[in-house]
Amino acid sequence: MTRFIFITGGVVSSLGKGLASAALGALLQARGFKVRLRKLDPYLNVDPGTMSPYQHGEVYVTDDGAETDLDLGHYERFTGVPTRQSDNITTGRIYSNVIAKERRGDYLGATVQVIPHITDAIKEFVQADLTDEDFCLVEVGGTVGDIESLPFLEAIRQLGNELGPDRALFTHVTLLPYIPAAGELKTKPTQHSVKELLSVGIQPQILLCRADRPIPDNERRKIALFCNIKQEAVIAALDVDTIYQVPISYHEQGFDTQVLKFFGMPVGGEPDLSRWQEIVSRVRHPEGEVTIAVVGKYTSLLDAYKSLGEALTHGGIANNVKVKLDWIDAEIFETDGAIHRLEGVHGILVPGGFGERGTEGKIKAAQFARERGIPYFGICFGMQMAVIEATRHLAGLENAGSSEFGHPDPAVVGLMTEWSRGNQLEKRAAGGDLGGTMRLGSYDCHLLPGTKVRDIYGADFIQERHRHRYEVNINFRDKLEAVGLTFSGLSPDGVLPEIVELPTHPWYIGVQFHPELKSKPFEPHPLFTSFIRAAIEQSRLV
């Protein structure tokens, strides 16, 4: 019997509902329970795949090829449970599914309405594809009071009644702002937020109150009184110096204990949080520091690279060093002399991206790393830029480029017009839809014996997650290998280049996939662990 925990948010956005969900999932796991985490997103986009990174942040890709919210990355990193297409839904997808059913006549001529048809579809999603999970944690995106969230709130209200108190718990995340002039935390925003939630028929049983300092007992009593909950269920969600402290902090505040007590389940002994304590200790007490320059396109919004930043941190944890990230807009390197900003860094990483802006700056960064012997890690677009740089400056084809930016001669990177989804071969026509028309999800890759990546992975075959429309043209393999670049990872049929490396360089690797999506604090991705190790060696040379 799966129990459902619904997590909503109020007052303002970005209070940490996703981290709270992930942390609670980790705490329940530490007590021996099996969990699944889900996210309801209230925007009208079918998925975030075509949304601007400045609007949405990172698009997190699952093994089964779903383009989802970045909170699913937190879920995977904290619990280790792989997320799926069935763990993220948007208003756009719900409406699309309902309208498709109406067109097919599934509703037998009924008037299709938000209640019951949209809410029924949401409830069906929440409960679908569950097997033996003890708990399903469902985060509702947005803020209570937003018009977009109303169908989701109504759906979980109905579910709460249908499941009953022995299977449904409502947790609400709010803000307790500190007003310096008054010298105290203010509870009124929380009171009004709960009142707004009550107006749609939901009484929260647990409150997570974001605050930058401990909550005095008198304020807890006040919140409990006005919000109609037990005082011990007013949980302080305190600011911490590392997100890996969050599960420990929530346990100290009694979050997991209150959940079990609500469901009438035995609390038992203390959960084993030793591995979290070890991670926090490594983050707080590193033995050294390395600086990694991240040369990207969306560096003004770091949420666009959320998993990347975490994966680099994981590489630092594995090597017991602090990783200092220098986020650099690639466009600055298109001006004379700016490339010297990279002098003194211990590693250069060019992440994924789309579009022409900043392209030449990324190519210059790859060239700088290659010529100066600085560890270079190119991910997706970053691999393509490394290949273009090598084609221009090693193979002598000065006009080499990507067909993503026009009609270069030669186009060493080209559009994938055909690819396999399941057992069907698909082709994207010019002017067709962009949404979902990429190579998405987990694919096999064969690693060549004797290569650096073969040593790093310690395996002949790997599986990694992809999100791209363009690929390096395999027809340039011989020409590039003749000047020193090795195509060290290929698709099983040998057609698609997945990894390139420069054997004569201390650490120069480009990958077409996104390894950051599979890195976890307790299982750092081997490429990031190796990259940071190479950066440590570089730091001794600078």
From Swiss-Prot:
**Binding of CTP, residues:** 13, 146-148, 186-191, 222
GO MF entries: ATP binding; CTP synthase activity; glutaminase activity; identical protein binding; metal ion binding
Which reactions fall under this protein's catalytic activity?
A: UTP + L-glutamine + ATP + H2O = CTP + L-glutamate + ADP + phosphate + 2 H(+); L-glutamine + H2O = L-glutamate + NH4(+); UTP + NH4(+) + ATP = CTP + ADP + phosphate + 2 H(+)
Its transmembrane ranges are none
Active-site positions on this chain: 380 (nucleophile), 514, 516
Positions with a binding annotation for L-glutamine: 54, 353, 381-384, 404, 469
Gene that specifies this protein: pyrG
Q: Which GO terms describe its biological process?
A: 'de novo' CTP biosynthetic process; pyrimidine nucleobase biosynthetic process
Q: Where does Mg(2+) bind?
A: 71, 139
- Which keywords does this chain's UniProt record carry? ATP-binding, Glutamine amidotransferase, Ligase, Magnesium, Metal-binding, Nucleotide-binding, Pyrimidine biosynthesis
Family the entry assigns: Belongs to the CTP synthase family.
The annotated modulation of its activity is: Allosterically activated by GTP, when glutamine is the substrate; GTP has no effect on the reaction when ammonia is the substrate. The allosteric effector GTP functions by stabilizing the protein conformation that binds the tetrahedral intermediate(s) formed during glutamine hydrolysis. Inhibited by the product CTP, via allosteric rather than competitive inhibition.
Origin organism is Rhodospirillum centenum (strain ATCC 51521 / SW)
Kindly report, in one word, the top-level EC class recorded for this enzyme: ligase
Question: Which pathway or pathways does this protein act in?
Answer: Pyrimidine metabolism; CTP biosynthesis via de novo pathway; CTP from UDP: step 2/2
Tell me the protein's name: CTP synthase
